[in-house]
UniProtKB/Swiss-Prot annotation:
PROSITE patterns in UniProt: ABC_TRANSPORTER_1, ABC_TRANSPORTER_2
InterPro entries xrefs: AAA+_ATPase, ABC_transporter-like_ATP-bd, ABC_transporter-like_CS, Metal_Ion_Import_ABC, P-loop_NTPase
Biological role: Part of a high-affinity transport system.
Protein name stated in the entry: Probable ABC transporter ATP-binding protein p29
Disulfide links within the chain: none
Protein source organism: Mesomycoplasma hyorhinis
Family of this protein: Belongs to the ABC transporter superfamily.
Top-rank taxon, per record: Bacteria
Length: 252
């Protein structure tokens, strides 16, 4: 039986930074489903990262709301909010791993069970968790690096470690903020393929922020373009052409 889609609904959203009165984006209406990746595009300073922060309640919302599977995230109590955050995972442009520790140890540290005192002191995982870590690394083609220090890996391999950590968490929402910013084109495409594959596996909503306009033509996706407090949504990347992109990134 097919799983129901996870869904993020943004309704009439207007928001600003907490430290000033500048309105970043006005009247945003958008549905994001787990059956299709959303690429978020815009030049620097247009509010892409601020929109992601709004999902985490880190900006001031003037109007509107965000629903996750029909539940208003701005109305969640403390316990419900904590539970929601466990469903959200981030992939950044730089590694969050501890460079002088091994791939395995970094993945163990990322497990939610690591907050348990037993894991914290003894750095141990269950047999099933170890088997899962091994399986994930094999799927990402870095099993041979399991006991290597993270700082001995290439940039692409380090991003695969970050993806492995996300796979262990099985998130319902994945936010990838410029995940291939420092990687060459071929590796960038491969990393995005892995992220999309992971999102499909876990039925996750996937939002990818990128400046790389070449990537959006490589994958079946929807596109949100942001510029000058306004947005344009395209249900398919096939609707995007070079003239549209030139306008978005003009003067960037």
């Amino acid at each position: 039986m097919k799983k129901p889609l996870n869904k993020l609904e943004i309704k009439n959203l207007t928001f600003k930074n907490k430290n000033d009165d500048y309105i970043i984006l006005k009247n945003l209406n958008l549905d994001i489903n787990s059956d299709k990746v959303l690429f978020l595009l815009g030049s620097s300073g247009q509010g892409k990262s601020s929109l992601l922060k709004t999902i985490l309640k880190q900006t001031d919302v003037i109007e509107g709301t965000i629903l996750f599977n029909k539940q208003d995230i701005f109305q969640l109590n403390k316990k419900e909010w904590k539970s929601f955050l466990k469903e959200v995972s981030f992939l950044n442009q730089t590694t969050t791993s501890i460079p002088f520790e091994t791939v395995f140890t970094n993945i163990v540290r990322s497990l939610q069970d690591y907050k348990n005192l037993f894991y914290n002191i003894f750095n141990l995982v269950s047999k099933s968790q170890k088997e899962e870590i091994t399986s994930v690394l094999k799927e990402l083609n870095i099993l041979d690096k399991i006991y290597h220090r993270v700082d001995s890996l290439s940039g692409g391999q380090q991003q695969r470690v970050e993806i492995a950590k996300l796979m262990m968490q099985k998130p319902k929402i994945i936010i990838a903020d410029e995940p291939t910013n420092f990687l060459d084109p071929n590796i960038s495409k491969n990393i995005i393929e892995l992220i999309i594959k992971m999102a499909k596996k876990f039925n996750s909503i996937l939002i990818i922020v990128t400046h790389n306009v070449n990537l959006i033509h490589e994958f079946d996706s929807s596109i949100l373009l942001i510029k000058n407090q306004e947005y344009h949504f395209y249900k398919s990347n096939k609707e995007i052409n070079s003239n549209i992109l030139d306008q978005v990134f003009k003067n960037d």
